[in-house]
Amino acid sequence: MSIYRLSPSPNFGVGEVMYESWEDGFTPEECERIIQYGESLCPENSVVGSDDESQEVAEQIRKSKNSWIELNKDTEWIYDRLGNILRCMNGMHWRFDIHGFHEHLQYTVYHDDKSFYRWHVDNMMMSDMPPRKLSMSVQLTDPADYEGGELQINDGTIHTVANDRGIVTVFPSYILHRVTPVTRGTRRSLVAVSYTHLTLPTSHNV
């Protein structure tokens, strides 16, 4: 599996927040490029993990399709963009010990058949994986093209995240979040999860 390694985040000392969004992280044209690439990989039914580390399709928990965007010469620019945004956001708000991306980027599609992802966290421990620290969600679709499909974060109060096209939202992987059912159109997003304590060889640095 490709590994995208990050150099340490700068310390801007702004203060910790539950989540933060980076406006205009990607242009509409770049969002279209990502969509075309993700669709070319033929997204399949999304799976969920379990305590015994098995994975299965469980539409009562998650109903969507996804494909995995590997790090290569055609996608390096996406990893670079996300890596730079992540370093800045982490330096401003959390200052976690983040080493990089240990999974491919997840291109996800929510169709108007009420596709959704119920409340969950991203930092479930897996024996062969380092701890997840920060999650990133990129809004690829123009919000006028669908209804529902809201990314929501829950700290006791439910917060609906801005869905402007190209916006990048970052939050700790232990934060409870969900995607509400899509009722019209199609919502497409890109998800990245950063890790700490990578011990495998480095293939890229930013």
Regions of interest found by a model, annotated:
Residues 1-168, 174-198:
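Fe(II)/2-oxoglutarate oxygenase catalytic core
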Residues 197-206:
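Single conserved hydrophobic/aromatic residue that forms the stacking wall/gate
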